Amino acid sequence: MENLYTSKEEKTKITFTAIDNKNLNDITEPGFYVSASWDNNFSNLPSEIDKPSSKAFYLVVFSVGGGTYCQQIIYSFKGLIYYRAVVGFGNNFTQWRKINLS
């Protein structure tokens, strides 16, 4: 029974790819990403976290069609959540939208 549990546990783990010094417009590959340092360097962050000591976050990317349809969700280590998307071929990302949970 223990081996079965371990096998199941391995299938449910999420692997995060560490990122730094990136343009978020270029991250269109589906996956889970992490910026683990407050002072990492990025472009195209939401303005509220594009400040010194605010750039630690998780990024989740959903994408199909080689980025033709792409969604990015940022979960800031400061408790802020943002969303944006590309909604068709040749289009740019929409502006970041803050998600309020309260």
Feature locations, PLM:
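Glycine-rich, flexible loop motifs
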Residues: E2-G79, V87-N91
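Trp- and S/T/G-rich repeat-edge/linker motifs of beta-rich repeat architectures
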Residues: N91-I99
